[in-house]
Amino acid sequence: IVRNSGGLGVVLDQGVLNISLIFKGQTETTIDEAFTVMYLLICKMFEDEDVDIHTHEIEQSYCPGKFDLSIDGKKFAGISQRRVRGGIAVQIYLCVEGSGSKRAAMMRDFYQHALKGETTKFRFPNIDSESMASLETLLNKDIKVQDVMFLLLYALKDLGAQLNMDPVTEDEWQRYEGYFEKMIERNAKMHQKLDL
């Protein structure tokens, strides 16, 4: 799957949770404000844990950025954004289960294989696999993606959000199917190029 925000690749598997916040309006919310809202939401979700969550770039992680989230200097999440029709979408991937350092090693190997030692105009990160970890590792407890989804719901409720369980409309379903088909086609093209 190719995500539609951010600049570099991230690992998306069953142990990673993605959350998106959509801010309506072209100019009412700045990118930094939207990032800060996501950061504060994550802090709220984990307020019962005895940890400090920091936001600053972890340079030797994959997809480094100034809104990397870390505990004890190890990145477990990254926030990205993109402009969407009528607003801003802020997206976060949370490395919940498994090994964050193994995911980082996989991305390091991916870049090394893709670059084949060539110099490029764009600078790719020099990934240190030990710069990343999962929440499971950092919190030193068994935590699953589903647990974090419940933490998200509880945090939103505590913050006064109203959660609506509206069914998907026919128009939304058709758009989803169209986007899904485009993603399948795009991924097939990438696989074809990789098989050469």
Model-derived features: positions:
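Beta-rich nucleic-acid/ligand-interaction surfaces
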Residues: 55-75, 173, 177
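Aromatic/basic-lined ligand-recognition segments
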Residues: 73-81, 89-91
